[in-house]
């Protein structure tokens, strides 16, 4: 078929498609004589028809086929000119239909039918002639839209060529033209639904006629009905490239047509194989995904959209998943239900289930990352409902629930697995699904045993929320309060007031704010010096909390149950005996524990009972101080409005007629709660709504004898226990684990449920459980940070660097060119542009006792070091290596060489310029210089002059990428001496990690240097870094490029020399805890507003 490449029709169509929109570029000013065009059209057809009649013998020759194709090319050109003129005429005068003599001749003489019959006899040239026919139909359909479909001389040969294409295997170019034509036909049918029956016919009528007249084979599906366009598109649903995209778009149009025509929906659901094909293809594409992910970034926790785009296997899988999501969204109800059933039984359970339950950690990380990506990608409630059922199913995996397995992985010692798990739970909590929240938290909290009896009446109160705001702000570590005071400008009166304070109340003696480096030029606090950062901006936290809480409240209002502290009578047991028993227990409680509410048991303790089914709890007469309320669900089959003295508003559980019935199942057993599972057929609910209705409750949660003696053993459930366990190790976790941990708890605090608030936001409510409460853990963290990080100048310097690094991290995240620089594409760009190198993680330490690397062991080679927070307007920012710092010049001016043994100095070296001058006069500087002059002569990179012998790290030290090979310097700071020695470290060249069939690389990977632990006794910190080959060698270090975050960070060099590694980690924890407490305070304040509004409504 090489001869066809030079045919006139191919060349003309090539020019047509090259114009951009697939239409031949015809000059609007062209004036053609309609009569001349018609005569030329008739002449070309007569010549082509003569060739057809002449070549009808055994088979046409090469010249015969070429001649017919040439004449067809001229005929198509004349038709396009005529249609173009007709469109201009129709715009000018839309009342009178324009005449099209060429098109009328084409239809009246049955030219297309004769052409099809001749093409069937072309033998080996059949595909070439079919290709030209498809191009002809494509051009006519695109220009005439639905007008030609109404004419039988055009429709009959079109149906014949489509029917003959079923079950055939065509070359790629012919497949492309076929899919394009089918796509155009779907667009036309979507706009003209009344023409749909032309392509949807039964085998007894139109198909049989076509078979008899046109020798067309019957459809291979063997069905009595056939939607021929849909049948031809099915084989291309999983095809790659533009063919697959166009086929899926056309199939979606057919699915949308099924909503308008029930016959189409019935045919697709009952007679086509689209649903099994979609599910099996999705499972096959999932099996091609890498079984393990090679992680090259220390903070990687989920797959980004860039990763999906740049990994071919993942891109194909996500295309198929998004197509299934779209089908469920637009298809007929029968198709939707069938696809959901196939998805659950054929993909979610047999494919995702075993993948998630694997025992290998790498496989678990990859499977959970894929699940997280799936949950973040799908939007259709039906699919989300299926995944919720999958997480809670207890029958498919030998009694083990997927949700329980995920909760156990929160306690994993592997940092990557822990972060991926927390990211997955962040996605799950963001679904605002009632069943998930019930299984994770609410079913353990509903009995109310985690709250003492005397505190249960406080749960629905609103006033204490404001006290909780002050409580969170008071938990700020002392060093952060001092740093905040130094950053805030003080008036003369404030200085006088401070000087008037007693000595025992004054803070430790520190330099004035003017002399301290810890004052950030852009550090914002309550709107002061805001700059561009949102750190310490309480207004930003309030706005975020308001928006998040409002969004969560809108979703929770659709739940089937209101999880509030309510009163409700016991059912099925004698009321008098229950009331008497409760009153006796109440009297014993107040007598034994000296409660203040005993006075309420006098005249006001009469038991009130009402006739009818709706009775109020008799314990209501005890009063608010008794605390004998219990957590109750209101029945879903009736509307109940109950009011009490503790501020509980009325709750009405009504129907949700606009939502689907949920298919998830979750039982609430144990904890003295019995619930009956029932599916209400008369109510259609959202996927977020649980179908559990609590109409029959045992009042055993009022068994105060159990409460009084067993409150200390109440469990909050494995999920909260795992979260609290991680929070207790806050100061030893990595920065990124803490970021995910605080984000997860913050998302829980967004829920407008007083039950959850009693754990997180209410500091006035005592929690009695088998683990320390949330507020107790926060107090312990504050005490630990205050004890290990006292308010000293060195601590404030480290705090300043930690704060600067987090602000710089924020700016880099905001200003990143792409949504996430964790992608493999960013790897390649980083390799191509070394001046944008990002810090990377060093090889992980082996052994059971290996500890996580400190985030302060990193330094960005792209950004100069700053002691103050990053600012584009910082006038003291210097990135030029030729400029030397003032502190270095002063130090070299007063320096003197000494070879005497150095006396012992403080464990933490002075870091500021003025402190170095002071250290010089006290002998510390000479000690450092003396140790430096004892180095060997081959360490030329460290000693170039007498002034460069000072190796104390200064705040103005600059960092640059490596320029002279693997040379490095190791600085060991011990408790008695500071010695500097040069050496070489085994630096491993970076790479993106080669992908394979079982793994692929995610995260920036450009350069890695080995990080070795310091084995020297009494060692407090170790720094590995390559010397800067440009500029003065003194004080120019590159620290170990361990990744601080996915987009890089600028950590001050002072963080590697001032204080121990533990103090630097504590500084990061202090800054993060300070910001998190502000966020929790903002959430508590906004939740009080939400509750007040809810009561008034």
From Swiss-Prot:
Bias (Polar residues): 1-21, 949-962
- Which of UniProt's keywords are assigned here? Phosphoprotein
- The UniProt annotation puts the region (Disordered) at 1-25, 639-684, 820-856, 932-1042
Q: Residues where Phosphoserine occurs?
A: 491, 823
Question: Where are stretches of biased composition, namely Low complexity?
Answer: 641-654, 824-852, 932-948, 973-985, 996-1006, 1013-1022
Q: Does the keyword Phosphoprotein apply?
A: yes
Tell me the domain of life: Eukaryota
Ranges of Gly residues composition bias in the record: 986-995
Family, per entry: Belongs to the FHIP family.
What protein name does the entry list? FHIP family protein GK23746
Which species expresses this protein natively?
Drosophila willistoni (Fruit fly)
